[in-house]
């Protein structure tokens, strides 16, 4: 089964050597998104709510580049620097879906790249 790396002009500039998205077998895999504004390259404030909104906006923009939306997400993995932010991130996350929600895993990662507070990766289906 062939893999493709689609164009994602709305994705923030990568912080490491990876593609923002990859597609195979009708599934689209988005690399973890952090609270980085793709237009300015600036990070969202050091507040988990602000960062979570930026993360979800980034996810929506990248999915939009691929002709997809939040309703196409089938699985998410949420990484938190601090599990005490679980409820705040849940509130933001839930506001982007009408339900039913995608399958999901949430873990405390301890430390995230560049001291971000939240990172979310998604799998979407065509």
Task: State each model region's role.
Residues 2-126:
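Short, polar/acidic, helix-capping and beta-turn segments at strand->helix junctions
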